[in-house]
A protein has these predicted regions:
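Conserved coupling/switch loops of ABC nucleotide-binding domains, chiefly the family-specific signature
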Residues: 62-65, 216
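Conserved ABC transporter NBD signature motif
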Residues: 64-72
Length: 365
């Protein structure tokens, strides 16, 4: 088991980096506590896999250190780090049985046969592989093969952490939830540090206790799923997390009022942004309500989508597109309507970053 510390870590694939843009992974300082379930979330190319490969030892960082507990492992080889890594595509030996695949890491370390057999049985029960232990891996489905890959990482009792790099990519959609649930059960049973890399917000938010969101090589926010949804620290987080994502509207802010085109929005906090900064108002569609015309901010309806659990209106206000929730039992004649914004759920951003204003009674928020 291990606490993983990233100390002033950065990486560039070019040999002579000079500017921040030269770095695929911009400087990161972060600690993953022992036994936690974490996710690295972000779009393709944001640096997730680079970071994972640095932790596992497949890539040496350009600068900074990786520590397991208080031990500097930056220059240690992968096999010396006691790390297990599960990749996008299952890594199994098709000519071997499931039992032989699970036993292989222990056999390579000359673990006695009786201990190996016992450990293989334990992991097989945990992963529901007991009934196929003596079948050839070549005859199994992709999700079963991925379970074998996971089992080969878990079978070593000395593993400090398990790293998952998009492990459900090849799994059928209807089986993904089941395998995610299995991972959560394993985490609870073994109390092992797990770091899960994905571009899929559903996978990250349902697996992890804390999520690290990455964008353009940098960490933009770390928090619980609730924190990321309720208080995004960056406009990217607001837009990337949620379906649909947060409405992000260019605005001008004066005190406790935001100006969006020719419309004004009252705020619950007072802001004093520096001159020249790009200001934006963010609010999630769940907190924007479509109403009959004349009862709020005037908008034009472009379409209304029924997404099963709710109806989402796509509207235009002062030339800006945004999404709003449609209350049950309300219908609209024509394309003219109004919006009501919940002032408690409005966030103000300067150059993409959340701004803390002062509440009307003078406190910071």
């Amino acid at each position: 088991m291990a606490r993983i510390t990233l100390d002033h870590l950065a990486h560039a694939y070019r040999p002579d980096p000079h500017t921040a843009d030269d770095y695929a992974l911009k400087e990161i300082n972060h600690v993953w506590s022992q036994g936690g379930a974490y996710a690295l979330l972000g779009p393709s190319g944001c640096g997730k896999t680079t970071l994972l490969n640095i932790i596992s030892g497949l890539v040496r960082p350009t600068r900074g250190r990786v520590l397991f507990d208080d031990l500097d492992v930056t220059d240690l080889a992968t096999e010396a780090r006691n790390i297990a890594q599960v990749f996008q595509f299952p890594v199994v030996y098709d000519t071997m049985s499931v039992r032989e695949n699970l036993a292989f890491p222990l056999k390579n370390r000359h673990v006695p046969r009786d201990r190996t057999a016992q450990r293989v049985e334990e992991i097989a029960r945990l992963l529901d592989l007991t009934r196929v232990l003596d079948r050839k891996a070549s005859n199994l489905t992709a999700d079963m093969k991925q379970k074998i890959s996971l089992g080969r990482g878990l079978v070593r009792p000395d593993v400090a952490a398990i790293l998952f790099d998009e492990p459900l990519t090849v799994i059928d959609p209807h089986l993904k939830w089941q395998l995610r649930s299995t991972l959560k059960e394993i985490h609870r049973a073994l109390d092992i540090t797990m770091i899960y890399v994905t571009h899929d917000q559903t996978e990250a938010l349902t697996f992890a206790d804390k999520v690290v969101v990455m964008h353009d090589g940098a960490v933009v926010q770390t928090g619980t799923p609730d924190e990321l949804f309720e208080r995004p620290a960056h406009t990217f987080v607001g837009h990337f997390i949620g379906s649909p994502g947060m409405n992000i509207l260019p605005c001008r802010v004066e005190g406790a009022t935001a100006f969006i085109g020719d419309q004004t929005v009252a705020l619950q906090r007072t802001y004093r942004p520096p001159y020249g900064e790009r200001m934006e108002l963010g609010i999630r569609p769940e907190f924007v309500r479509l109403q009959p015309r004349g009862t709020g901010l005037p908008v034009r309806i472009r379409r209304i989508d029924d997404i099963g659990r709710a109806r989402i209106a796509r509207v235009e206000m002062s030339g800006r597109a945004l999404a709003a929730s449609v209350p049950d039992g309300i219908s609209f004649d024509g394309d003219e309507a109004a919006l009501a914004l919940d002032p408690r759920q409005i966030h103000i951003y300067a150059n993409g970053h959340l701004v803390s204003g002062e509440s009307i009674d003078g406190g910071r928020a």
